[in-house]
Design a protein with these regions (language model features):
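Short, conserved loop/helix-junction motifs that constitute active-site signature segments
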Residues: 26, 84-87
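Catalytic core of DAGKc-family lipid kinases
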Residues: 101-173
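ATP/NTP phosphate-donor binding region
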Residues: 1-67, 108-123, 134-143
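Generic beta-sheet signal
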Residues: 35, 71, 92-94
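Short glycine/serine/threonine-rich phosphate/pyrophosphate-binding segments
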Residues: 14-15, 75-81, 173
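Short, acidic/small-residue loops that bind anionic groups at enzyme active sites
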Residues: 87-105
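N-terminal glycine-rich "phosphate-gripper" loop used for MgATP/nucleotide binding
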Residues: 66, 70-74, 81-83
Length: 175
């Protein structure tokens, strides 16, 4: 299997979990690539080099990746939207925190989950990928989200117009 690993390079609590994951995947013959900032974080904090590849963007993993592992919480998993976009790469959420709704594999169940994954005993939850377009350049990067967007008006007395489309079909316009 070809695995990509993503995590936020800020949480020392997940170092041993990530190290165990990499060891398990390597021992089972998986090809691994780690998101570059996270790989640097791991190397700096564990004082250890990892014999894995790295990646920086969607372009690096969009083809030839079987799964992307997200290590952290739900926020970390939501970050992966910008990495997988419309590639249909399944995201496996490993919860390194206290509570996870999207990242549902706990540290305690990691080995069981990895074994099931290797045997093909898993199911996929379909998620909705949304794209937001605006008349003004309001995005610094990607204009996509998983499941929902939150809109805030800059001026409370101004009106906004929202056009909603589903698969290119006008659903309803709201003023």
């Amino acid at each position: 299997m070809k695995i990509a690993i993503y995590g936020r390079p800020v949480n020392n609590n997940q170092l041993s979990l990530t190290e165990s994951l990499i060891k398990h995947l390597t021992d089972t013959g998986c090809s691994i690539r780690i998101h570059s900032p996270y790989k640097k974080f791991l190397t700096d904090n564990l004082k250890k080099e990892f014999n894995t590849g790295s990646f920086d963007s969607y372009e690096d993993i969009k083809s030839g990746t079987d799964f992307l592992f997200s290590i952290g919480g739900d926020g970390t998993l939501l970050d992966t939207v910008f990495l997988v976009k419309d590639s249909n790469i399944p995201v496996v959420g490993i919860n390194a925190g206290r509570l996870g709704f999207l990242s549902s594999i706990s540290k305690e169940n990691l080995e069981i989950a990895l074994s099931s994954l290797a045997k093909g005993h898993y199911s996929l939850d379909a998620r909705t990928l949304l794209r937001l377009e605006a008349n003004h350049p309001i995005f610094e990067g990607e204009n996509i989200a998983l499941n929902e967007f939150t809109l805030h008006k800059k001026e409370t007395s101004s009106m906004i117009t929202i056009h909603t489309y589903l698969n290119g079909e006008d659903r309803k316009s709201v003023v």
